[in-house]
Protein backbone atom coordinates (compact mmCIF):
# COMPACT_ATOMS: atom_id res chain seq x y z
CA UNK A 1 0.00 0.00 0.00
CA UNK A 2 2.89 2.34 0.73
CA UNK A 3 4.32 1.81 -2.75
CA UNK A 4 0.98 2.73 -4.33
CA UNK A 5 0.83 5.89 -2.22
CA UNK A 6 4.37 6.88 -3.19
CA UNK A 7 3.67 6.28 -6.88
CA UNK A 8 0.46 8.32 -6.68
CA UNK A 9 2.30 11.21 -5.00
CA UNK A 10 5.05 11.04 -7.62
CA UNK A 11 2.45 11.06 -10.42
CA UNK A 12 0.73 14.05 -8.80
CA UNK A 13 4.01 15.98 -8.57
CA UNK A 14 4.93 15.11 -12.17
CA UNK A 15 1.49 16.09 -13.48
CA UNK A 16 1.60 19.35 -11.52
CA UNK A 17 5.00 20.19 -12.98
CA UNK A 18 3.87 19.44 -16.52
CA UNK A 19 0.72 21.53 -16.11
CA UNK A 20 2.71 24.36 -14.51
CA UNK A 21 4.78 24.63 -17.68
CA UNK A 22 2.27 23.71 -20.38
CA UNK A 23 -0.79 25.77 -19.42
CA UNK A 24 0.92 29.20 -19.67
CA UNK A 25 2.55 28.12 -22.94
CA UNK A 26 -0.85 27.15 -24.35
CA UNK A 27 -2.39 30.48 -23.32
CA UNK A 28 0.56 32.47 -24.70
CA UNK A 29 0.59 30.86 -28.13
CA UNK A 30 -1.52 32.59 -30.81
CA UNK A 31 -3.85 29.70 -31.63
CA UNK A 32 -2.92 27.50 -28.70
CA UNK A 33 -6.10 27.42 -26.66
CA UNK A 34 -8.49 26.44 -29.43
CA UNK A 35 -6.23 23.65 -30.65
CA UNK A 36 -5.02 22.34 -27.26
CA UNK A 37 -7.94 22.80 -24.89
CA UNK A 38 -8.76 19.06 -24.87
CA UNK A 39 -5.22 18.28 -23.72
CA UNK A 40 -5.41 20.92 -20.98
CA UNK A 41 -8.78 19.61 -19.80
CA UNK A 42 -7.47 16.03 -19.82
CA UNK A 43 -4.43 17.03 -17.79
CA UNK A 44 -6.59 18.94 -15.33
CA UNK A 45 -8.93 15.96 -14.95
CA UNK A 46 -5.96 13.66 -14.38
CA UNK A 47 -4.58 16.07 -11.76
CA UNK A 48 -7.92 16.27 -9.95
CA UNK A 49 -8.26 12.49 -9.94
CA UNK A 50 -4.75 12.13 -8.54
CA UNK A 51 -5.52 14.62 -5.76
CA UNK A 52 -8.48 12.51 -4.65
CA UNK A 53 -6.50 9.28 -5.03
CA UNK A 54 -3.65 10.60 -2.87
CA UNK A 55 -6.17 11.74 -0.26
CA UNK A 56 -7.88 8.35 -0.15
CA UNK A 57 -4.59 6.45 0.00
CA UNK A 58 -3.32 8.78 2.72
CA UNK A 59 -6.37 8.05 4.86
CA UNK A 60 -5.83 4.31 4.42
CA UNK A 61 -2.15 4.43 5.36
CA UNK A 62 -2.34 6.62 8.46
Swiss-Prot record:
It is a multi-pass membrane protein. Belongs to the PsbZ family. This is Photosystem II reaction center protein Z. It is found in: Plastid, Chloroplast thylakoid membrane. It comes from Spinacia oleracea (Spinach). Disulfide bonds: none annotated. It comes from the Eukaryota. PSII is composed of 1 copy each of membrane proteins PsbA, PsbB, PsbC, PsbD, PsbE, PsbF, PsbH, PsbI, PsbJ, PsbK, PsbL, PsbM, PsbT, PsbY, PsbZ, Psb30/Ycf12, at least 3 peripheral proteins of the oxygen-evolving complex and a large number of cofactors. It forms dimeric complexes. InterPro entries: PSII_PsbZ (IPR002644), PSII_PsbZ_sf (IPR036512). Keywords: Chloroplast, Membrane, Photosynthesis, Photosystem II, Plastid, Reaction center, Thylakoid, Transmembrane, Transmembrane helix.
Amino acid sequence: MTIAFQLAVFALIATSSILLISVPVVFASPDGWSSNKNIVFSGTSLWLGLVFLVGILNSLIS
